[in-house]
Regions:
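Glycine- and acidic-residue-biased ligand/ion/polar-headgroup-sensing regions
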Residues: 39, 50-63, 79-80
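Phosphate-/nucleic-acid-contacting segments
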Residues: 156-230
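Cyclic-nucleotide recognition modules
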Residues: 73-131
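Short, small/polar residue-rich loop motifs at catalytic or cofactor-binding pockets
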Residues: 28-29, 47-49
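Short phosphate-coordinating micro-motif centered on Lys-Gly-acidic
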Residues: 41-47
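A small-molecule sensor/coupling module
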Residues: 22, 95, 113-155
């Protein structure tokens, strides 16, 4: 497990913990590693789980799919990101999401239930870890709130501008990369890809954006871009 420490140190779940404490926790929560190829599923909707995943290599998509294959992307998790925490913390809860690999990946599986009972070794860092878990769950709520804000807009144009604006503000820059390719962006915003591509072309012609693949540059009035750098 020591080889994963550089990634684990950056994870909010292990914030404020020493390397020895992290290794002790991994033992406490029965950490196990698995690796799979792109497009393989880690969790499927309809299942239940007692473990949450931590990406240590590659990236995964948290999605919802219907019987006809229509995909709604809820989030994209890279190295250091968690997924499945709410379900792992709720024994017997049935997943209404699936987690699928966007590229070849390796993850750590952690048994959250071991954190919610008294630690048999009475770890001094146990309470700190629980506080960190609460912080991780709170951050997931904020991520979902962002998505609700974007998809709640009435038009494809408004959804795009809402999303691009939020990324720009979060990164404090008018020039930025997004984590999605075009199909994934359409799935995340719950819009048709062709309609989205048409709207992106219109926004470029109007001079509001410049884009190349997943890179975007926004153009705003001088009196509204204070605090955001090009």
């Amino acid at each position: 497990m020591k080889k994963y420490l550089p990634i684990l140190r950056t994870s909010p779940f292990f914030k404020g913990l020493t390397d020895n404490e992290i290794l002790s926790i991994l033992h406490c929560v029965n950490a196990a590693t698995i690796s799979r190829k792109r497009d393989s599923y880690i969790f499927r909707a309809g299942d239940s789980t007692e473990v949450m995943g931590l990406v240590v290599a590659g990236c995964v998509l948290v999605i919802q799919e219907d019987l006809w294959g229509h995909r709604n992307i809820l989030s994209k998790c890279h190295a250091g990101d968690f997924f499945g925490e709410p379900y792992a913390a709720s024994p017997g809860a049935v997943l209404n999401v699936s987690v699928v690999a966007d590229e070849d990946w390796e993850i750590l599986l952690l048994n959250v239930q071991r954190l919610l009972v008294s630690c048999p070794t009475i770890c001094e860092h146990h309470q700190k870890l629980i506080r960190n878990l609460v912080g991780v769950l709170a951050n997931k709520i904020l991520i979902l709130n962002d998505k609700i804000t974007h998809v709640g807009k009435r038009t494809t144009r408004d959804k795009l501008l809402s999303y691009l604006s939020s990324v720009s503000i979060r990164q404090a820059s008018l020039s930025f990369d997004i984590p999605f390719d075009r199909q994934q962006l359409a799935d995340y915003l719950c819009i048709d890809r062709a309609a989205m591509s048409s709207e992106i072309s219109k926004l470029q012609k109007e001079g509001l954006i410049k884009t190349n693949r997943n890179h975007f540059e926004l153009t705003v009035c001088n009196d509204t871009d204070s605090g955001i750098k090009m």
